[in-house]
């Protein structure tokens, strides 16, 4: 009888041991966020980030838009809007990141745009911090995708998707009301002027997209670079000139710009640099401002090369 009991317990222990070795394994936890970023790199965030550094003015604005500003622990020196960004720790410029400050913030992820070098991306990742690049591929159109992606990363997906849909509707509405190409006024945006040379936005830039969405023609639409000659400027002889508000008085009083018909006719308008110089949610303000100027400007000339 004792031998039987011993064999029974031995059999039971072996069976339990065998069962334990083949117990079902716990399924691996699904990653919070997976995506191929704008640098075509596979991105995986295991957990929802709670501490985020943004080195892109556009991304920073979008985080405020979707209601995720409380997760921002650091921004670049160029992130100046909305005004609340003044209270957020600065981590340097887009070309001179202060890695020591950035590391001290213990971010879960760093969000970047198109102006960060691959060298800086590598340096951040070597510190063990994930980097996600979200480039607004075509400026205004690309802003909608940025809203969606930032919404997902910050757990504000519903708000991000809603704002993206609204943004696309705004673009479609303005395109629908734009005049025919032959009726568009030629607009010259002064990026730079004076002794250092003349500069304007060439084709395939977000500034050209802003001007065209406003129903106008970009004076630099045939250029591939930002610098232009005086001969080119006077040949184009733009209907309307836009210049940063703080530079408008100097521009209209400086020779030889005083000889341009737009200057003579009082068709030089100051514009907020934050609306047009960088890709931003405020680009739509520039679109509407330029569209209104084109509607109310007295000139009917449309100069073509």
Locate the predicted segments by residue.
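Sec-dependent N-terminal signal peptides
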Residues: 6-14
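Short helices/loops that flank or line small-molecule/ion binding pockets
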Residues: 99-106, 127, 229-237
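A short, structured surface patch at a secondary-structure boundary
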Residues: 51-105, 109-115, 219-222
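Short helix-initiation/N-cap motifs at beta->coil->alpha
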Residues: 36-40, 91-100, 137, 223-231
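Bacterial Sec-exported substrate-binding components of ABC uptake systems
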Residues: 2-6, 18-58, 153, 157-188, ...
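Structured C-terminal subdomain patch of bacterial secreted/periplasmic proteins
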Residues: 142-152, 161-165, 172, 178, ...
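Alpha-helical, coiled-coil/dimerization segments enriched in small aliphatic residues
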Residues: 78-81, 164, 198-226
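Extracytoplasmic ligand-binding site segments that recognize negatively charged/polar headgroups
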Residues: 119, 136-148, 183-206
